[in-house]
Amino acid sequence: MTSSPTVNLLDLDAAGLVAYCDSLGEKPFRAKQLQRWIHQYNAADFDGMTDLAKSLREKLKGRASITMPPVVSDHISSDGTRKWLVDVGNGNAVETVYIPEETRGTLCVSSQAGCAVNCRFCSTGKQGFSRNLGTGEIIGQLRMAEFALRASRGTAGGRATGGDGKGERVVTNVVMMGMGEPLLNYDAVVPAMRLMLDDNAYGLSRRRVTLSTSGVVPMMDRLGADLPVALAVSLHAPNDALRDELVPLNKKYPLRELMAACQRYLKVAPRDFITFEYCMLDGVNDSEAHARELLAVTRDVPCKFNLIPFNPFPESGLLRSKSEQIKRFAQVLMDAGVVTTVRKTRGDDIDAACGQLAGAVKDRTRLAERTGKGKVIEVRAV
């Protein structure tokens, strides 16, 4: 007779924990206790969960675990941006990036090892697609970052609830903008986001969790029905011909379908606008004519634009738009009354800037050889 495999409790959202506790003959309130210990107190084992009955702790020891993927490296940029490289097995690694600002701290979370969308300007796509991350590997990035950041500030004790003192939350916003297309890993991403929003876990509001998609139209509709959070759309081109080239997914879901999906999503969204992300590529999509075309294609969608200076990498064959051209492009949009921001490049000295999350593609295929599997490398400032 073989024993059942242990259940990683990080893979379970609130409903999953209730069902698991029920399978052990336990009441639903035990699930809330477990969830708080795991996500608010950073418990690594069951012995310290002192408000659980000893009999339940003994059951859990033999049947469950709280398993985090190991951190391979931890780097801090000169601008305070912090990047972790996380080993997700079989030579694959994903990256998690924390961006500190004066009034908030934003965590950029990965959803896949690699990416199948293969946008021309994104280094992650050049490494190819390996696999979807599990719910525990996704929410584990937030858990790891929150408590690592609190430890570095000397506030490791207490609950991460956003209150005063030692329980003050460091990560105030999460953006699903790391490696991968979140809507192509829907069944793992949504439970992870439910935990982000759960008051017994991280307690973020729907306005503070943003999912970025390249435009998987059917799953945008499903997300709107299941868990509408703030939405960003990787647009990057004002017409189908150019977007087909830059974002191959456009061939399946062209701009007219994408704009209609955005309109439907806004009926249930926590914000009253869609954020359109637009990577500024020199001589490709950055003319004033492109800007006017962009206004036309998005005219029926309440929106704001986030212009992203391209972060060059060798395989792309692309260049960043010149600063003056970005300003001219932005001015066309602003003159039309559309809120437009230019993303400040953060963490590019540690390859943590937008579009750089794969690092050197060849390095990802030799993760174990480079670092030793599971080894944690000391933080270094750069």
Curated annotation (Swiss-Prot):
Domain of life: Bacteria
Binding sites annotated in the UniProt record for S-adenosyl-L-methionine: G180, E181, S212, S234, L235, H236, N311
Binding site for [4Fe-4S] cluster: C115, C119, C122
Stored InterPro entries: Aldolase_TIM, Methyltransferase_A, RlmN_N, RNA_MTrfase_RlmN, rRNA_lsu_MTrfase_RlmN/Cfr, rSAM
Cofactor note: Binds 1 [4Fe-4S] cluster. The cluster is coordinated with 3 cysteines and an exchangeable S-adenosyl-L-methionine.
Localisation per UniProt entry: Cytoplasm
Cited PROSITE patterns: RADICAL_SAM
Reaction it catalyzes: adenosine(2503) in 23S rRNA + 2 reduced [2Fe-2S]-[ferredoxin] + 2 S-adenosyl-L-methionine = 2-methyladenosine(2503) in 23S rRNA + 5'-deoxyadenosine + L-methionine + 2 oxidized [2Fe-2S]-[ferredoxin] + S-adenosyl-L-homocysteine; adenosine(37) in tRNA + 2 reduced [2Fe-2S]-[ferredoxin] + 2 S-adenosyl-L-methionine = 2-methyladenosine(37) in tRNA + 5'-deoxyadenosine + L-methionine + 2 oxidized [2Fe-2S]-[ferredoxin] + S-adenosyl-L-homocysteine
GO biological process, one term: tRNA methylation
E.C. number(s) listed in UniProt: 2.1.1.192
Entry GO terms, CC: cytoplasm
This protein's UniProt keywords: 4Fe-4S, Cytoplasm, Disulfide bond, Iron, Iron-sulfur, Metal-binding, Methyltransferase, rRNA processing, S-adenosyl-L-methionine, Transferase, tRNA processing
Coiled coil: none
GO molecular function, one term: rRNA (adenine(2503)-C2-)-methyltransferase activity
Family: Belongs to the radical SAM superfamily. RlmN family.
NCBIfam families reported for this sequence: rRNA_mod_RlmN
More info: Reaction proceeds by a ping-pong mechanism involving intermediate methylation of a conserved cysteine residue.
Biological role: Specifically methylates position 2 of adenine 2503 in 23S rRNA and position 2 of adenine 37 in tRNAs. m2A2503 modification seems to play a crucial role in the proofreading step occurring at the peptidyl transferase center and thus would serve to optimize ribosomal fidelity.
PANTHER family xrefs: 23S RRNA METHYLTRANSFERASE, RADICAL SAM CORE DOMAIN-CONTAINING PROTEIN
Protein name: Dual-specificity RNA methyltransferase RlmN
Taxonomy of the source species: Bacteria, Pseudomonadati, Pseudomonadota, Betaproteobacteria, Burkholderiales
Gene encoding the protein: rlmN
